[in-house]
Amino acid sequence: MYAIIRTGGKQYKVQAGDVVQVDKLEQALGAEFEINEVLMVGGESTAVGQPLVKGAKVTVVVTKQAKTRKEIVFKKKRRQGYRKFATHKQEFTELFVKAISFDGKTAKSDEAATVVDVKAVRAEKAQARVAARKERAANKGPAEVVKKAAKKVAKKKVAKKAVKKTVKKATKTGAKKKAAKKTSKKA
């Protein structure tokens, strides 16, 4: 049995045992609640709502409250010097579909919902990193103080004397061309 539910203005096709990401819902982590906005129920017999199916409900459990990956928002208008750069993370709720019930029939999930607390997992990882850093520092032992040798100062090299460069004299043909150019220009 499957159902098409509506939440957050969007429609989702779900079956018992599915995990669905929907827009953020104000529900506690691990909370079990019913969604009554069922647009259609399918399976052995199909029921289409106008707009909702009466007596149909989907029981779900909140398994995760988190944010999506970072999305880059980049706007540009060419040749105008207009560039905007921003990022965005959308909050979402992950739901585990426990059961679908309609017209006295109920389709239940064989599996149990696994609730994940993202903040607790992140805190555990941070503590593990700190503990590993402290352990490495303890294994390394006390730092030894080593005196640096004084730097040797190199003597400056004496600069070479400048050599006069000889300038070639202009040939007669070059002088004629310059003169010709000057006379050809008119003011």
UniProtKB/Swiss-Prot annotation:
InterPro entries: bL21-like, bL21-like_sf, Ribosomal_bL21. One of its GO terms (cellular component) is ribonucleoprotein complex. Residues 157-187 are annotated as: Disordered. GO terms for molecular function: rRNA binding; structural constituent of ribosome. It comes from the Bacteria. SUPFAM superfamilies: L21p-like. Signal peptide: none annotated. Keywords: Ribonucleoprotein, Ribosomal protein, RNA-binding, rRNA-binding. GO terms for biological process: translation. Part of the 50S ribosomal subunit. Contacts protein L20. This protein binds to 23S rRNA in the presence of protein L20. Belongs to the bacterial ribosomal protein bL21 family. This is Large ribosomal subunit protein bL21. It comes from Bdellovibrio bacteriovorus (strain ATCC 15356 / DSM 50701 / NCIMB 9529 / HD100). The gene is rplU.
